[in-house]
């Protein structure tokens, strides 16, 4: 086992604080509408230019192991805020730096670290409760666009396109961000339910110019097994032919004789038909087949519930206005499902999202929810170069997370004002002893840090602005982009309450742990590896007599 170096008390805390400050100083330069850029070297290709706090934090590794521990802990603050709300990483980093600096000063002055932590925790709980009171619902498109704009560093085009996407697919819809091919941002929306399985045979294509199979007013046969024997299907095919409607078959697979017969019938015009594999695998496939059944008002033909293909009738089939199949995807438009059944299925999936702890499962459930409730929107980010594309895409993703958070928990005045206004919640707050009171007081100073940093980045004097904002009330604050004071909500400067709350909770949680640190342990630096020299070979002098 490698030897370890241990640092105790102030010696360790000083090193840790140095690491905290290096990372936080690099990240906080990006905060606010006049935040500066950070350039990051890449091992290949052009350097990355970014104003995204979490991208900066991820790149920082320090040579000194003890300083690096401090930097990594603050990086964890940014990651926690990002995981919880998807944005607010820079605010969380600025808050953590302020709390750690103030806290370690108090520890050096002889305060009890555990009581300081309890004071910080009390004040955090009170401020979070006040932020919830300050928050206002965010439902209209204009407010959503404003939140997106602020999060994307005052880029109106990003805020507007996110608001438009949310309006089209509702708050439950899936919005994905991709790299575009032009200079302008583009939005495309997929109507209805789309899943990533295409036609099983190109002979189903009936629109050769666009290479798609399009079925108008089709019936849908949903089968939870492989179909290889055409005889099983004859009764249902005859019934569909009599009804004179097209048929879409969604099954685990359609192969051999069954597929060949369907193709021949389709080409001869006896039954207009197309077949596609069911999406997903295993239990997820069964769930997605059931989703399609609910959406189209059909029944999944499954032996588990005592249904077989031979006994299938038209009553078991789903209905839709139109189905479009291409090589990769199938889209079902305007399914004829009963609204109450669809709503019930949606609430069931929401419940599963709340119960699962797996990020992968959560993502897949969110996709299913979107397909049932709203649809899927794709934002294609346009830019003039690859470097700009990466930077812009990161900002669009941040803005998207921020707008989702705003819809979820409402909005508060932006620009660091909400945290300053929430100070009234801890005006009369008292701890159990003097050291806890110091913990409460240091958080009171620390929550001003984001406003101070925004002002500093815009080239103004932080103390003057903070005093003037404190003298005001309600939504009164400072617009760093224009240098004006006024109502932040009216000026369109909004922050999602969830982002501000998550940033404060993540910062005070990690900072409290750092304040209560008494010992730090790290591997001893390997001097030989650093020198890279060859070992001493002096003992080989007696080899001269060898032949």
Swiss-Prot record:
<comment type="subunit">
    <text>Forms a cylinder of 14 subunits composed of two heptameric rings stacked back-to-back. Interacts with the co-chaperonin GroES.</text>
</comment>
<keyword id="KW-0547">Nucleotide-binding</keyword>
<dbReference type="InterPro" id="IPR001844">
    <property type="entry name" value="Cpn60/GroEL"/>
</dbReference>
<protein>
    <recommendedName>
        <fullName>Chaperonin GroEL</fullName>
        <ecNumber>5.6.1.7</ecNumber>
    </recommendedName>
</protein>
<keyword id="KW-0143">Chaperone</keyword>
<feature type="binding site">
    <location>
        <begin position="479"/>
        <end position="481"/>
    </location>
    <ligand>
        <name>ATP</name>
    </ligand>
</feature>
<dbReference type="Pfam" id="PF00118">
    <property type="entry name" value="Cpn60_TCP1"/>
</dbReference>
<feature type="binding site">
    <location>
        <position position="51"/>
    </location>
    <ligand>
        <name>ATP</name>
    </ligand>
</feature>
<dbReference type="InterPro" id="IPR027409">
    <property type="entry name" value="GroEL-like_apical_dom_sf"/>
</dbReference>
<dbReference type="InterPro" id="IPR027413">
    <property type="entry name" value="GROEL-like_equatorial_sf"/>
</dbReference>
<dbReference type="GO" id="GO:0042026">
    <property type="term" value="P:protein refolding"/>
</dbReference>
<feature type="binding site">
    <location>
        <begin position="30"/>
        <end position="33"/>
    </location>
    <ligand>
        <name>ATP</name>
    </ligand>
</feature>
<dbReference type="InterPro" id="IPR027410">
    <property type="entry name" value="TCP-1-like_intermed_sf"/>
</dbReference>
<keyword id="KW-0413">Isomerase</keyword>
<dbReference type="GO" id="GO:0005524">
    <property type="term" value="F:ATP binding"/>
</dbReference>
<dbReference type="GO" id="GO:0005737">
    <property type="term" value="C:cytoplasm"/>
</dbReference>
<feature type="binding site">
    <location>
        <position position="415"/>
    </location>
    <ligand>
        <name>ATP</name>
    </ligand>
</feature>
<keyword id="KW-0963">Cytoplasm</keyword>
<comment type="function">
    <text>Together with its co-chaperonin GroES, plays an essential role in assisting protein folding. The GroEL-GroES system forms a nano-cage that allows encapsulation of the non-native substrate proteins and provides a physical environment optimized to promote and accelerate protein folding.</text>
</comment>
<comment type="similarity">
    <text>Belongs to the chaperonin (HSP60) family.</text>
</comment>
<dbReference type="InterPro" id="IPR002423">
    <property type="entry name" value="Cpn60/GroEL/TCP-1"/>
</dbReference>
<dbReference type="GO" id="GO:0140662">
    <property type="term" value="F:ATP-dependent protein folding chaperone"/>
</dbReference>
<feature type="binding site">
    <location>
        <begin position="87"/>
        <end position="91"/>
    </location>
    <ligand>
        <name>ATP</name>
    </ligand>
</feature>
<dbReference type="GO" id="GO:0016853">
    <property type="term" value="F:isomerase activity"/>
</dbReference>
<dbReference type="GO" id="GO:0051082">
    <property type="term" value="F:unfolded protein binding"/>
</dbReference>
<keyword id="KW-0067">ATP-binding</keyword>
<dbReference type="InterPro" id="IPR018370">
    <property type="entry name" value="Chaperonin_Cpn60_CS"/>
</dbReference>
<feature type="binding site">
    <location>
        <position position="495"/>
    </location>
    <ligand>
        <name>ATP</name>
    </ligand>
</feature>
């Amino acid at each position: 086992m490698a030897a370890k170096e241990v640092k105790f008390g102030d010696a360790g805390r000083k090193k840790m604080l140095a690491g905290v400050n290096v990372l936080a100083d690099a990240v906080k330069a990006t905060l606010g509408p006049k935040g500066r850029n950070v350039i990051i070297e890449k091992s290949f290709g052009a350097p990355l230019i970014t104003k995204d706090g979490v991208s900066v934090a991820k790149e920082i590794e320090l040579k000194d192991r003890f300083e690096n521990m401090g930097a990594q802990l603050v990086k964890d603050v940014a990651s926690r805020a990002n995981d919880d709300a998807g944005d607010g990483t820079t605010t969380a980093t600025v808050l953590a730096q302020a709390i750690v600096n103030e806290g370690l000063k108090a520890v050096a002055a002889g305060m009890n670290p555990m009581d300081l932590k309890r004071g910080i925790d009390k004040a955090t709980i009170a401020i979070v409760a006040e932020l919830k009171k300050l928050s206002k619902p965010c439902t209209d498109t204009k407010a959503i666009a404003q939140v997106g704009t602020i999060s994307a560093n005052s880029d109106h085009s990003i805020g507007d396109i996110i608001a438009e996407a949310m309006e089209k697919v509702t708050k439950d819809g899936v919005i994905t961000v991709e790299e575009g091919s032009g200079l302008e941002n583009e939005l495309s929306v997929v109507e209805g339910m789309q899943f990533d399985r295409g036609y099983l045979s190109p002979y189903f294509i009936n629109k050769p110019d666009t290479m798609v199979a399009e079925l108008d007013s089709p019936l849908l046969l949903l089968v939870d097994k492989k179909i290889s024997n055409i005889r099983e299907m004859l009764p249902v095919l005859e019934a569909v032919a009599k009804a004179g409607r097209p048929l879409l078959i969604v099954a685990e697979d359609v192969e051999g004789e069954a597929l060949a017969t369907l193709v021949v019938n389709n080409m001869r015009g006896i039954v207009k038909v197309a077949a596609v594999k069911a999406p997903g695998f295993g239990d997820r496939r069964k769930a997605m087949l059931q989703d399609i059944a609910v959406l189209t008002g059909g029944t999944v033909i499954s032996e588990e519930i005592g249904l077989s293909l031979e006994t299938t009738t038209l009553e078991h089939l789903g209905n839709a206005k139109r189905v479009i199949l291409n090589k990769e995807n199938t889209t079902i438009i305007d399914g004829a499902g009963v609204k109450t059944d669809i709503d019930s299925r949606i609430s069931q999936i929401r419940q599963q999202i709340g119960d699962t702890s797996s990020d992968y499962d959560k993502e897949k459930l969110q996709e299913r929810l979107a397909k049932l409730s709203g649809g899927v929107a794709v934002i294609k980010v346009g830019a003039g170069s690859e470097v700009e594309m990466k930077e812009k895409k990161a900002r669009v993703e941040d803005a998207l997370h921020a707008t989702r958070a705003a819809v979820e928990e409402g909005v508060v005045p932006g620009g660091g004002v909400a945290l300053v206004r929430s100070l009234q919640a801890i005006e009369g707050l008292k701890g159990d002893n003097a050291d806890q009171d110091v913990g409460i007081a240091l958080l009171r100073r620390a929550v001003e840090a984001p406003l101070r940093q925004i002002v500093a980045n815009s080239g103004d004097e932080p103390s003057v602005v903070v005093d003037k904002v404190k003298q005001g009330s309600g939504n009164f604050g400072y617009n760093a982009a224009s240098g004006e004071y006024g109502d932040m909500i009216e000026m369109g400067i909004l922050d999602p309450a969830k982002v501000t709350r998550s940033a404060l909770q993540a910062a005070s949680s990690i900072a409290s742990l750092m304040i209560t640190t008494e010992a730090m342990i790290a591997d001893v630096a390997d001097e030989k590896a650093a020198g890279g020299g060859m070992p001493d070979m002096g003992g080989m002098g007696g080899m001269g007599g060898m032949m």
